[in-house]
A protein has these predicted regions:
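A compositional/biophysical signature of low hydrophobicity enriched in polar/charged and small residues
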Residues: 1-142
């Protein structure tokens, strides 16, 4: 059955959610936290990895290795000028830089890394994280 069939068949929302969870379509739930409002906020970075894919395995082996680190929040295979997009978090800029240098950059198939530190989060997982106000001149105040 499709979601539409369930919804139009008079099935409750709870039953639809249960079915989606059972089938593995809903993989989990997560709270969106505005870490910038905490004193003990963490630093996050987007790390671009260039990778030489392995025969018969492609990028999978490297992606699995990268995913195994607790500092890694997300991993995406990309089209374009680099291969893997890795979202990393740490307590400080130095922690993230050290992790990239000691762990990610030393993986066998990784040929280069480029790290971009997140300066501010405006929207995450479709949730607005900051209120943007206009001043009298029509400019944004943050």
């Amino acid at each position: 059955e499709t979601i539409r069939d369930l919804a139009f068949g008079g099935v409750s929302t709870e039953d639809i959610i249960y079915e989606l969870e059972k089938e593995g379509i809903i993989r989990g739930y997560k709270a969106v936290i505005d870490w910038d409002s905490f004193d003990d906020a963490y630093v996050s970075a987007i790390v671009e990895l260039n990778v030489v894919p392995k025969a018969d395995l492609g990028f999978e082996e490297v992606a699995e290795k990268v995913m195994s680190y607790h500092e890694v929040e997300s991993v995406y295979l990309m089209s374009g000028s680099y291969d893997l997009n890795v979202v990393v978090k740490g307590k400080t800029l130095q922690d993230v830089a050290r992790f990239v240098a000691r762990e990610l950059a030393t993986i066998d198939s990784v040929t280069s890394t480029t790290t971009h530190f997140v300066m501010r989060r405006y929207k995450e997982m479709d949730v607005h994280l900051c209120d943007m106000e206009h001043d009298d001149r029509g400019q944004f105040l943050l």
